[in-house]
Amino acid sequence: MNILILGSGGREHSLAWAIKQNPKCDNVFVSPGNAGIGQICNCIEINILDAKQVLKAVKEYSIDFVLIGPEAPLAAGVSDVLKNEGILTFGPSKASSQLETSKKFTKEICDAAGAPTAEYKSFASLEPALAYIKTKGAPLVVKADGLAAGKGVIVATDIEMALTAVREIFGGSFGDAGTSVVIEEFMEGEEASLFVLVDGKTILPIGTAQDHKRVGEGDTGLNTGGMGAYSPAPILDQSVVNKTIDRIIRPTMYEMMDRGMPFTGVLYAGLMIKDSNPRLVEYNVRFGDPECQVLMMRLGGQILDALLSTAKGELGDVKINWADDHSITVVMASSGYPGSYEKGTVINGLDDLPSDSNFVCFHAGTEKQDGKIVANGGRVLNVTTRANTLIEAQRSAYQMIKNIDWPQGFYRKDIGWRGL
């Protein structure tokens, strides 16, 4: 079958890499892709937010299955249009994507479903939000309501920081994402993520992961889209996974069905775990990035069967075969990220890296210029390895990085520390 993946990051590179291992797959097309994806797939240029352009590509390239990687096309309703045209598509509807695109919506769903999460209040204007912060005190978590590329969440350790965050959100720092704000209690515990596939009725867990959102070692500095991840997450043992599904995910899915917007796709539950009890931090309605990379490294080609069954509503027949392995990904980013950074810097040494089922350098913000691979984004490379233990996987990843010649790049040197 011919498959079209929408997206251009390390997530999409890892999905393409895994899907290509399945004998059902004939050709993989990716739009817009990147330099690394272009080495293993056909990259095509279309506006992935424009459903008409996506439909045209589906017909032109005889596509049998469309997989939507990032959140923006989901928020734009591309999945709805494709499904209405009878195209087999993996990705939730625009309505059910609100579990990610609106923090306020998610909180209301959790309230109705009785799913444990942080206490909160939402505000549509500045002054009441400022007054609330002064009343509550710190620490607090301030969230822009809409999509902000993973950077719209501020953990405010003092009142002044919280006040500044709210002023920046309402002042337009996050564009349309900042038309309203959610202010939450600061939850204590350890954060980790559970990924499940949902076909509207059946819930299938497909792995756990822990990412590293802060830019600096020791989880310091600014929030980013993610500087690395590893799987499995030790804190998410089977007991905690079962509690998460029973107390959080299943009640959420029932509430979505009751509202006439059943969820189908992948649901990423960001969790805070304390004393083996999970509370919901956030939902994402697509594979995380960089969490997807470690999941794909462990799942391989069987993921295509699971994605197809999800899209067809036949998830009840699927079983995931797990190896007793560990995977880690270390993100190499452009100096200055998550602030301003230089584009067009040349990356050497990539051709000499090992590449097999245990070692892959997934590309994110790269492109090809004059025959050379150059950086054109903030997060640029995802050095990903798999081994029998986490420490072995970690050593392999950092050994691979030593062979990459990119003076303008940087990376955290402690990815995986919580699991060791």
Predicted segments with their positions:
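Short acidic-hydrophobic, aromatic-tinged amphipathic segments that line or gate anion-handling sites
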Residues: 43-49, 121-125, 156
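Generic C-terminus detector
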Residues: 366-370, 374-420
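A conserved helix-loop-beta module that forms one wall/lid of the active-site cleft
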Residues: 90-152
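ATP-binding N-terminal substructure of ATP-dependent carboxylate-amine bond-forming enzymes
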Residues: 1-94
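Active-site "cap" helix and flanking loop/linker of ATP-utilizing ligase/carboxylase catalytic domains
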Residues: 245-267, 284-356, 369
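Short, charged, surface-exposed secondary-structure boundary motifs
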Residues: 38-40, 55, 98-104, 216-217
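Internal nucleotide-binding/catalytic subdomain
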Residues: 152-292
